[in-house]
Amino acid sequence: MQNTLEKQKIQSRRQIYPSLSMRIDRLDRMLDMMLEYQTQIPEALSEDFGHRPEMLTKFAELAATFDSIHFIKKNLKSWMKPERRKATPPFNLFGAKAYIQYQPVGVVGIISPWNYPFNLTFGPLAVVLAALTISPVVVVIPDESICVTCD
């Protein structure tokens, strides 16, 4: 685990500041993956839980995650805009302008729980992929009790 984390830290330092189109592409690929496996995901979760109603999984896991991703995509452009601030003296006397430009740093870890593993993994993952202040490098650690879902 420590070795993987160290490799991810090195990789995060090499990452460029992700553009809007790169972030949207990552979110679109996540949506495509979810749509491609939308029948297998409820089956895997049902097998992990012994029995879990398909509609529960579709609403609580898939639909909630879809909504999160669509909300992020809708607002991402405005979230990425630099925030204007007042320049401090003496710089403001010379017409200086100040902005805050959020940039990703570091590595994010997501440890997913057993009860709603898909939504509580991919919901935060979508936020991380689009986020302004955290890294596009993520280490996901799923709960051991959902081994079929992880496959």
Language model segments and positions:
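Rossmann-like NAD(P) dinucleotide-binding subdomain of oxidoreductase/dehydrogenase enzymes
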Residues: 88-151
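N-terminal Rossmann-like NAD(P)+-binding subdomain of aldehyde/semialdehyde dehydrogenases
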Residues: 1-97
